[in-house]
Amino acid sequence: MRLAVRLPVALLLLALLAGCSWLRHRPTDTPSLASPDELRRAYSLVSDPSRYCDKVHGSWLGKLIGLALAQPVEGWYKEGIRERAEEVGAYPVQGYFPSNFRGIPGCEPWLYGNLAGSPPNDDVEQMLLALVTLRERGVDPTPRDIAEIWDKYLPYGNVASGVALYNIRRGIWPPESATTDNPYQNRIGGHMRVDIWGMVAPGCPALAADLAERDASLAHTGEGIYGARFVAAAVSLAMFERDPKTILTQALEFIPADCEYATYVRDVIGWHAQYPDWEDAYAELDRKYGFYPDGTREREYDDPRFDRSIPRYQWNDARLGLATLNGAACALALLYGEGDFARTICLSTMIGYDTDCNAGTVGAIVGASIGASQIPPYWIEPLQDTYRSHVKPIGKEASISAIARETALYGYQVIASRLIEHP
């Protein structure tokens, strides 16, 4: 009876906050993948709009702040980041890079003093398509649902998502969209865009991982999917947990114990226990996993189909794009960041590899733990509550807080629908 009484009130509050209708819900077609105890605990959060929206808003802000911080050094290695940052007195990294920082070409909009609203980023564009999927297809979307939303609204894709989008628009649907002429199946693309599935399944990591796998299956297999499952589970766990080691250890339960991704993360947990200084742990990580057996960090694909003159195959086989290596880098930043928002995203930025993706991922996890209300204003204010999107249903200038409120609305539906249908 308590659920029946509270459900309409909380839904009404969230619907008013989000400015959208909750009537698009469709019943779930699959088992809940969450225990009754997990669902009841999740319901205690999602039925408290103020507290839940703060958590979701914190995760969205953490994502966007981490991306903005690290975008100027996207795809750089630790040594190059340090060298350029030292040129302008910005090492160790403790804030946004200053306006005189020499970063990647076109990085000026992300530099402090220039940053005025969050510029578009492919990680976020694809997360927003998950939000649109929840809006248009309901809270139990299939891979085909997500793919059809991509087909309809995704303006561009990079690396694995670019190949998958090309396949989808030729009528090749998941899972074949991931396996057809796609050399990037084990890359970071799933890992970098699935935070939202953890946000809408708070404290239900198996459910979050399952939803993330549906999303990642458009463009990834194997380690690429395991990374997506791990990140979504971590965000889900972070909604109730603040200790990074606990989050990482528990998130490992939702990927195969013998997969490479799990091995990399377990190694980082071991190095963290061994070394007080993050740089020593990084040295172990980079030595063991940062290179191919021939000592190189990147190589060309042998298959003539993947000619780099073709736009969707313009990226080579670089270690820094692997889900496994970047998952380990995220784990390192989370452990040595010790739950401190600024320290965690700054460490992630100094570590490098697929730098912006990783800082965004750890920002989303810590942001979910602490909530928007605990993120220092220095980090939030340059975003001006604005994300500039190329996704038409979102709008060219979207309110970040409104995005968070709509996400929270669907999170309520995800939990309440399963609590009713799968008690």
Task: Walk through the language-model features, giving the residues of each.
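Active-site-surrounding "flap" and adjacent substrate/cofactor-binding loops of secreted or lumenal enzymes
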Residues: V73-L111, V124, A147
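Catalytic phosphate/nucleotide-handling subdomain of diverse soluble enzymes
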Residues: I65, L69, W76-G89, H220-E223, ...
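Active-site cavity-forming subdomains of large catalytic enzyme subunits
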Residues: A116-T221, I225-R229, F240
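Accessory "access/gating" subregions that flank catalytic or transport cores
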Residues: Y43-S47, Y166-R170, P174-Q185, V194-C204, ...
